[in-house]
C-alpha cells in the first residue's frame, strides 16, 4: 500500500504527522510493513468473524469500520489538543450476541406487540372487556337473525 502512494500524498502525510504528532496508522491492508509481533496481532484480529470476542488490547476499530493497530507511540491528540480518557473507554467491550431461532423471535415480537396494545395509557384491561365480550358473542347471535328466522316471527 505504501508503494502505491503518490509523492504528493506522502508529503501531505508527513506534514500532517509533523503538525499533529500523529503517525500513520497501519490498517489491515498495509499491516505487512509492521514488525512480526504487531503483524501477528493485526492478523489475529482480522482473521476470524469472532474477532470481537478476543481482540488484543492494541487493536481497535475506528470510524472507518476497519480494524487497525493502535501503536504505543500514538498520542491521543485531536486537532492538536491532548484528550485524556480512561483506559477502559479505549478497550473494546466483549460482544455478547443473543441469537434466537426465528420462531422464538417471532413469538417475542407478537407478545411485545400484544402487551403494547394492552398497556396503552388511555386503555386499561377493563376497558377492553366489553369489546372482547361483543366480538366473542355477537357473531353467533347475528347468525340467528337470518331472513328465514326473522320472517318466522313476523308472519
UniProtKB/Swiss-Prot annotation:
It is a single-pass membrane protein. Keywords: Membrane, Transmembrane, Transmembrane helix. Disulfide bonds: none annotated. The chain crosses the membrane at residues 115-135. Residues 8-22 have a biased composition (Basic and acidic residues). Residues 1-34 are annotated as: Disordered. One of its GO terms (cellular component) is membrane. It is found in: Membrane. This is Putative uncharacterized protein RPP38-DT. It comes from Homo sapiens.
